[in-house]
């Protein structure tokens, strides 16, 4: 675990210390679909393609979850691109439930 002010990074390493994957969470003041404020948010997670579907991502999420429970949090939130169905399925496999869908807008100035 690597900690910053409101960000924490998690590394999954092989026995020889080569990286298998990483995840980053931050504490947000608000996140769509979440009930608590502030709320921990899974900003990103990446697993080496050779090690996907072997429990590395689940282990990272479980480690994060345990730490957050110890800190008194009651939920972990995340997001995924609306077209990324693979990510939706992985999130569900890790115990996340979809809360809402949002369309973002931008105006060029």
What is each PLM-predicted segment?
Residues 43, 47, 53-66, 89-93:
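Conserved acetyl-CoA-binding loop-helix of GNAT-fold acetyltransferases
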Residues 1-14:
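Active-site rim helix/loop that mediates acceptor-substrate recognition in acyltransferases
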Residues 15-21, 86, 99:
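Glycine-rich acetyl-CoA-binding "A-motif" of GNAT/NAT acetyltransferases
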Residues 11, 18-27, 41, 46:
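Conserved beta-strand in the GNAT
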Residues 36-49, 103:
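Conserved acetyl-CoA binding element of GNAT-fold acetyltransferases
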Residues 92-101:
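Conserved acetyl-CoA-binding loop of GNAT-fold acetyltransferases
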Residues 76-87, 106:
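Conserved beta-strand-loop-alpha-helix junction that forms the acyl-donor binding cleft
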Residues 61, 68-80:
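Conserved GNAT acetyl-CoA-binding A-motif
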């Amino acid at each position: 675990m690597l900690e910053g002010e409101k960000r924490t990074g998690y590394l999954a390493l092989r026995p020889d210390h080569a990286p298998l994957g990483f995840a980053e969470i931050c504490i947000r003041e608000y996140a769509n679909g979440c009930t608590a404020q502030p709320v921990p948010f899974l900003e990103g997670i990446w697993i080496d393609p050779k090690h996907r579907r072997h429990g590395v991502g689940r282990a990272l999420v479980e480690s994060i979850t345990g730490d957050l429970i110890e800190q008194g949090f009651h939920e972990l939130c995340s997001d995924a691109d609306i077209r990324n169905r693979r990510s939706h399925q992985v999130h569900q496999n890790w115990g996340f439930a979809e809360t809402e869908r949002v369309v973002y807008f931008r105006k060029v100035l």
